[in-house]
Amino acid sequence: MVAQQQGKFTVGDYLAERLAQVGVRHHFVVPGDYNLILLDKLQAHPDLKEVGCANELNCSLAAEGYARANGISACVVTYSVGALSAFNGTGSAYAENLPLVLISGSPNTNDPSQYHILHHTLGHPDYTYQYEMAKKITCCAVAIPRAIDAPRLIDRALRAAILARKPCYIEIPTNLAGATCVRPGPISAITDPITSDKSALEAAAKCAAEYLDGKLKPVILVGPKAGRAGSEKELIEFAEAMGCAVALQPAAKGMFPEDHKQFVGIFWGQVSSDAADAMVHWADAMICVGAVFNDYSTVGWTAVPNIPLMTVDMDHVTFPGAHFSRVRMCEFLSHLATQVTFNDSTMIEYKRLKPDPPHVHTAEREEPLSRKEISRQVQEMLTDKTSLFVDTGDSWFNGIQLKLPPGAKFEIEMQWGHIGWSIPAAFGYALRHPDRHTIVLVGDGSFQVTAQEVSQMVRFKVPITIMLINNRGYTIEVEIHDGSYNKIKNWDYAMLVEAFNSTDGHAKGLLANTAGELADAIKVAESHKEGPTLIECTIDQDDCSKELITWGHYVAAANARPPRNMSVQE
């Protein structure tokens, strides 16, 4: 009887069961003839729901957003024409430390040995190229050669993704998805975490406490990896034990409570908020918890802290004169919290430097809409049930300046920086968190890259509010390096929603040219639960934040640096 049951169990069934066991509830797909049998197997699993996407780029970005909400996601595409497009969102998941399982169908196992030239390929019989490419953008890539190998390879890839907080790649030939294999063993073999080495953890905490005892003005800088490591609770515990000022990198907004008395703002060099920049430069030591220093977060390398750094990463700790491997962030912060000496010198200084709250002008109803008025009205929308997505561009700066109430979530893609990311990512996120109000701030140029996924929001009746700021161009590129290529064709965005509705959709597209029209549109959006609401907010092309102008200037200068050690002939 057991043998008979196992004979009915297939590679596709194995993958479906493992995905369900690790917590996947929705899998994002674009069908193609190399993955159709596999899709049938995934569809048949009672705990998995298939979510079709408009294209493979959007599919991968929707899975990226889902991983933000769920901790792990799955994207299923066809060979080459599908996977190569999905590599973009997979790259985002790698850069942003998100476990995304990219699954691709592939040619029949008989074709390579017979030197067949197949469709959807490069036109030669070597079909390893996609697998080789996937190795560069995942923590683990596997190509299943035989059904008997599937359990071992699938388990290897999933465990690697979960432990590394990075994407993995699983390639399944079209004739193996329905081939028989054994049933899976206990899921703990995949999901059991690797804990800190006890000796390394104790030594790291002891040395770190001694190191910090010698500092007069320490400050904590929180980066995006703190959230990916799930260390928010331990971070608060450690910060309160230290008593010092806590600043956040822009990509870490929302990972430390903004109403906490030790929160001093966003550290972003010349475009920092509150007094964060002054506090960082006044400090004599910085504890970097999950920090990422790249050209964007350092404003073109002009805002790299010039003080000793203690780096607390997801699995190791480094500070001047010491390095400790296999030390998990959560455990280290908890251990260190019990050993540090309370030192609130930076908070005393912050109280002296803390700026007064800025005056916020409330526009009259008939006033033309402006960027500041949009931000003011969005601020009033934020609650403890809000998840705010900000796309690459001025939406970054507008979103960073908003005050998050306790419980509100903030999502940004600053390492990968893909314009248009927010539309499919918010869709994927909202499917996993239907209890939250997902709001998107996106520019018109970014929206045009991934606009098709609004149709899936309509299809699945996802009540996302899209605040589309229409200033007729790629404003962020204008500030970095202007040119005619930054001009785009204007769309009637509000009317576009009607095309997505067709005869059975319930999305709403609204146009706001004035402050009053925006206020009215927001009321409609907040009461509409049968699909997305897109509010096209028209503003002047030159109406952008001064922070974007400043930041763009420095990033442009960094991009324009001449090659090193190159002689220049007159």
UniProtKB/Swiss-Prot annotation:
Cofactors demanded by this protein: a metal cation; thiamine diphosphate
Catalytic activity: a 2-oxocarboxylate + H(+) = an aldehyde + CO2
UniProt KW Transferase keyword: no
Pathway assignment: Carbohydrate metabolism; pyruvate metabolism
Compartments reported by the entry: Cytoplasm
UniProt GO molecular function: identical protein binding; magnesium ion binding; pyruvate decarboxylase activity; thiamine pyrophosphate binding
GO cellular component entries: cytosol
Subunit record text: Homomer.
Protein name according to UniProt: Pyruvate decarboxylase
